[in-house]
Amino acid sequence: KVTPAQANAINEAIRQRAVELCGEYRAKGCEKAAANAIRRAVRLTTGVNSIRELPRCEYAVAMEQVKMWDDFKTMRALRSKADKEARHE
């Protein structure tokens, strides 16, 4: 398993990537949902239930996947959801 510090580093990288992507797609307020989508993708790729259960040898692979993650369909859906919520306020 990854160390707690490595798990925290992966989670921080996920949060940073989510903020970057929400800015790129002009989707304000979707950072948490985007982070969840990235986290889900990493979990599905590595076959674990939690980032903390990731094998130590997969740490670099997971970090690279977080850096490269950019799912247009997911981000478009998050943006349209954020736009709808903004209109209802």
Language-model segments: residues:
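A general nucleic-acid interaction/assembly signal
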Residues: K1-E89
